[in-house]
């Protein structure tokens, strides 16, 4: 309900200032929250066309397009993948410190079948770039890749390193989930939980 009210306000504001970037971005964000990918795509597209050097607009556009592709049938999704990849790559080029875009590329290259551009090598490249920007993100990304390929022992090493540095809810959840659901090691999972709750 709050989103609907906000959407009305922003839409009204846009009538008087049709090119107000922040307003267009908010409308895109609201649409994204409501999983209205078409509206999100339309708003972010306006922004990336008007501000082609803004990495965040490219990232958000690629993200909304990627979510739409995930919910579309296979043939339709195939036609969208190149543009999703291109948007993320543009964002990464425009901003060498953009963490979210590098995460998006890691996930994209890991989840895509090899025949349409998926590649562990490419995913590792962006995991390395993440490592240079933030050790926690780097280890989490490498752990994510290991989990995807069922290399759970390697994933444990990476997730443990991420947790030692970050000691956050995110690093805890990744390692805990690995122990509990992948390595099926309740003892390790419970020990980790106790340590995290008593820190």
What are these regions (language model features)?
Residues 31, 65, 72, 109, ...:
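Residue at a conserved register position within TPR or TPR-like alpha-solenoid repeats
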Residues 21-22, 55-56, 99-100, 135-138, ...:
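Helix-start (N-cap) detector for alpha-helical repeat units in TPR-like alpha-solenoids
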Residues 22, 26-29, 60, 104, ...:
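Canonical tetratricopeptide repeat
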Residues 3, 37, 81, 120, ...:
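TPR-repeat structural position
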Residues 18, 52, 96, 132-135, ...:
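Short coil turns that delineate tetratricopeptide repeat
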Residues 34, 68, 112, 117, ...:
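Structural motif corresponding to the intra-repeat A-B loop/turn of tetratricopeptide repeats
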């Amino acid at each position: 309900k709050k989103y609907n009210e906000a959407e009305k306000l922003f839409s009204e504001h846009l009538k008087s200032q049709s090119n107000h970037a922040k307003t267009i971005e908010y409308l895109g964000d609201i649409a994204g929250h409501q999983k209205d990918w078409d509206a999100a795509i339309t708003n972010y597209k306006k922004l990336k066309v008007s501000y082609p050097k803004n990495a965040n607009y490219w990232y958000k556009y690629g993200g909304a397009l990627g979510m739409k592709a995930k919910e579309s049938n296979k043939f339709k999704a195939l036609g969208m993948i190149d543009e999703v990849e291109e948007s993320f790559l543009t964002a990464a080029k425009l901003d060498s410190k953009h963490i979210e875009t590098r995460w998006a590329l890691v996930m994209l290259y890991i989840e895509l079948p090899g025949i349409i551009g998926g590649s562990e090598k490419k995913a590792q490249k962006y995991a390395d770039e993440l490592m240079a920007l933030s050790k926690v993100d780097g280890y989490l990304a490498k752990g994510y890749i290991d989990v995807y390929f069922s290399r759970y022992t390697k994933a444990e090493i990476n997730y443990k390193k991420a947790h030692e540095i970050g000691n956050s809810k995110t690093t805890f959840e990744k390692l805990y989930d690995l122990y509990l659901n992948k390595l099926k090691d309740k003892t390790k999972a419970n020990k980790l939980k106790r340590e995290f709750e008593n820190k």
